[in-house]
């Protein structure tokens, strides 16, 4: 059996206004090669962008990999490593019996994560971590670029 490739992925999400224009930024490192990705949406939330970034990164991998995925989002990290198990058992309801927010993205992240061996890591945001700072720049630039793309799953609070 061949050994899985080790990929380092760094992600960040940004939103101006929350809700408002938003974007995500991704930096992927593999054997000295770096790939950056980002995109923006006209109306979304910070949490949706924090979830979409690792989804896009994992979906971009062409084969199963060993991944070290680093984000400054405790929401994303806690959700995918801890909370998701209970949500799935309860039919995507929280412990208060309310529907899980951003369920479309949680399901997509769960599916994308199944294909890889992932070490989910957290880094403090805005603390000088080079890749995290770069992701932040990419995400903010995407949000500030007057994006017109619609975040199809975004549902405003009523």
From Swiss-Prot:
Instruction: Give an example GO cellular component term for this record.
Output: cytoplasm
Keyword Hydrolase assigned:
yes
Cited InterPro entries: RNase_H (IPR050092), RNaseH-like_sf (IPR012337), RNaseH_domain (IPR002156), RNaseH_sf (IPR036397), RNaseHI (IPR022892)
User: Which superkingdom, per the lineage?
Assistant: Bacteria
Q: Which residue intervals define the domain RNase H type-1 in the entry?
A: 3-144
Q: What is its main location?
A: cytoplasm
Described purpose of this protein according to its UniProt entry:
Endonuclease that specifically degrades the RNA of RNA-DNA hybrids.
Mind telling me what this protein is named? Ribonuclease H
| Species of provenance | Shewanella sp. (strain ANA-3)
């Amino acid at each position: 059996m061949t050994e899985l490739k080790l990929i380092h992925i760094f992600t960040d999400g940004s939103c101006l206004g929350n809700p408002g224009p938003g974007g995500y930024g991704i930096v992927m490192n593999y054997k000295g090669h770096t790939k950056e990705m980002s995109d923006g949406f006209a109306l979304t939330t910070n949490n949706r962008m924090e979830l979409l970034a690792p989804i896009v990164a994992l979906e971009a991998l062409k084969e199963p990999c060993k991944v070290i995925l680093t984000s400054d989002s405790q929401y994303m990290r806690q959700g995918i490593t801890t909370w998701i198990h209970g949500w799935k058992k309860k039919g995507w309801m929280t412990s208060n019996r309310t529907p899980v927010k951003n369920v479309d993205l949680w399901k997509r992240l769960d599916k994308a994560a199944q294909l890889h061996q992932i070490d989910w890591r957290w880094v403090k945001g805005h603390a000088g971590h080079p890749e995290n700072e770069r992701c932040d720049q990419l995400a903010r630039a995407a949000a500030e670029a007057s994006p017109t793309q619609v975040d199809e799953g975004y549902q405003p609070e009523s």
